[in-house]
């Protein structure tokens, strides 16, 4: 599933509960900041679009939030913090509710929102004033800056970011990486200036605790992924049988998609 948040003349979210590789986007000319999210379903059925990121919220001003990771104390926090009932099942949505409960969007309110969270996370929060907040927890994130273009681009890993830039903008200037540490809250404003403050990461999962999540079904997710690949195989010159052959060779669905789209792994 994929959703886009765009800030230009106004904030809007465009979304569909479909695999990202099936989506085609037409971006407004006045879009100044774009935040996208592709989701591997863990908690909350992705076929219900309200479960998919980025989520909308309001803390005096509208914002959109996306989360990379899994939280395992969301139900406890909803009860302890008296958060309003919601049909949204996704664990990440508790961060939206906590931030909205703060009544403002600031370093202080973001810090108060993320410090009680337990699990794995890196968050991005985009507000209607063109401010992008990146909250770096214990999940990866790579941020590039292209100074002459006044452009910031980020992705969960450097490998993904480089592949995306190679396909989308192959002749760009050489970027430099903006280094972000675990525990950083980085805000990039509409002028491209960035400010960093810190939050306490002690509640995040350290890899020693044992926990499990409801709705976690890796095999169901993988089977859906394979079905999606077979459904679009013909557009790339392959057949569903070819997908099965690749799988029999031991390739994972992600590697098969790379072969289909790029001709390489």
Identify the function of each model-found stretch.
Residues 3, 8-10, 14-265:
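Conserved short alpha-helical segments that host acidic/polar catalytic motifs at enzyme active sites
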């Amino acid at each position: 599933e994929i959703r886009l948040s765009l800030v230009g003349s106004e904030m809007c979210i465009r979304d569909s509960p479909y695999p990202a590789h099936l989506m085609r986007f037409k971006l407004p000319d006045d879009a100044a900041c774009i935040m996208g999210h592709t989701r591997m379903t863990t908690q909350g059925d992705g076929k219900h679009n309200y479960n998919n990121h980025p989520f909308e919220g309001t803390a005096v001003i509208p914002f959109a939030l996306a989360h990379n990771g899994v939280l395992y104390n969301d139900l406890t926090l909803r009860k302890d913090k008296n958060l309003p009932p919601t049909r949204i099942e996704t664990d990440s949505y508790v961060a939206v509710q906590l931030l909205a409960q703060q009544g403002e969007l600031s370093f202080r309110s973001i810090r108060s929102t993320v410090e009680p969270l337990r699990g794995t996370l890196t968050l991005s929060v985009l507000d209607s004033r063109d401010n992008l907040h990146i909250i770096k927890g214990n999940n990866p994130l790579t941020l590039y800056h292209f100074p002459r273009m006044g452009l910031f681009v980020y992705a969960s890993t450097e490998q993904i970011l480089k592949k995306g830039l190679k396909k989308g903008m192959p002749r760009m200037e050489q970027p430099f990486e903006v280094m972000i540490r675990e525990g950083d809250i980085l805000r990039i404003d509409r002028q491209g200036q960035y400010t960093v403050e810190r939050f306490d990461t002690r509640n995040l999962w350290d890899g020693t605790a044992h926990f499990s999540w409801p709705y976690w079904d890796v095999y169901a997710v993988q089977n859906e992924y394979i079905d999606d690949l077979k459904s679009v195989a013909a557009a790339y010159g392959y057949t569903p049988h070819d997908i099965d052959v690749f799988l029999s060779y031991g390739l994972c669905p992600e590697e098969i998609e790379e072969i289909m789209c790029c001709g390489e792994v």
